[in-house]
Amino acid sequence: MAALKMTISCFLFLQVIYCLLSSFAPTNVQGLKVGFYDKACPKAELIVKKSVFEAVKNDRTIAAPLLRMFFHDCFVRGCEGSVLLELKNKKDEKNSIPNLTLRGFEIIDNVKAALEKECPGIVSCSDVLALVARDAMVALNGPSWEVETGRRDGLVTNITEALLNLPSPFNNISSLITQFQSKGLDKKDLVVLSGGHTIGNGHCPQITNRLYNFTGKGDSDPNLDTEYAVKLRGKCKPTDTTTALEMDPGSFKTFDESYFKLVSQRRGLFQSDAALLDNQETKSYVLKSLNSDGSTFFKDFGVSMVKMGRIGVLTGQVGEVRKKCRMVN
């Protein structure tokens, strides 16, 4: 009897230890895991990296659109590649107003073609988007993170869903917080992912209202630095619909923390950038990032990208693995 009690006690002790260790172990969400293709297509991530590095080497400005494409995919229907689909009637996400300035689709096509040649029908387009976004940042000497893979591709794309789900450059802080929370992202994620604006361009129509008619009285946004507003008006006339503007002037091809310095100086390009100062928690992170050497932001960016990459994923037998990213099988 004593031996039996000892055996039971040891078993219970081991169970407790197992549970404690499990609570600290990294968990995979909804079937995703790092290295999902290690056996089925062991060269997959290397193939993606090689293609992306070559693309960024040829054009450093392409990195930001590739990052943005993944963001736009995840916020609409989840990270399942619907932003890549094309419909004959043009009623797809690609043709929604927020997505008209997306570019880099040919790079996704090239990566997918290389993967299909190596291991047909294995790597999903949604995973391609996730891997490409990471590798584009690394190619700029930006942050790196382990990408969870195992997503499957969606079958539906809808032009109206992008307008309903994508955060707008005109949003105030309350709207931004609500939108991010609806995707399982918190205030810190909002600020960190907004930091992606350290690279890339905006366009005049996105700030015309801030410059010329913010309250309907022909005035500019009082939250925009006066001197900076003058410079922007010199580049963007009220009817300008095409001119591109550097999100992070002088540093828009370099991934760094300088975006937060601009925001703190009231020089964020979009109204949504300025809004980060309108909440104590988001403002605190902006100011905290000013006093780091970038390492905190880089680490946090990777964490938030992993979280974003879990939004609404399809795994297992749900969805499909497309042969070509622009169409369902």
From Swiss-Prot:
Heme b binds at H197. Binds 1 heme b (iron(II)-protoporphyrin IX) group per subunit. Binds 2 calcium ions per subunit. The record marks R68 as: Transition state stabilizer. Its EC number is 1.11.1.7. Transmembrane segments: none annotated. Ca(2+) 2 binds at T198, D248, S251, D256. It comes from the Eukaryota. It catalyses: 2 a phenolic donor + H2O2 = 2 a phenolic radical donor + 2 H2O. Substrate binds at P167. This is Peroxidase 56. GO terms for molecular function: heme binding; lactoperoxidase activity; metal ion binding. Residues 1-31 form the signal peptide. Ca(2+) 1 binds at D73, V76, G78, E80, S82. Removal of H(2)O(2), oxidation of toxic reductants, biosynthesis and degradation of lignin, suberization, auxin catabolism, response to environmental stresses such as wounding, pathogen attack and oxidative stress. These functions might be dependent on each isozyme/isoform in each plant tissue. The active site is at H72. Belongs to the peroxidase family. Classical plant (class III) peroxidase subfamily. GO terms for biological process: hydrogen peroxide catabolic process; response to oxidative stress. One of its GO terms (cellular component) is extracellular region. PROSITE patterns: PEROXIDASE_1, PEROXIDASE_2, PEROXIDASE_4. Glycans are attached at N158, N172, N213. It comes from Arabidopsis thaliana. Its main location: secreted. It holds the Pfam family peroxidase. Disulfide bonds join C41-C119, C74-C79, C125-C325, C204-C236.
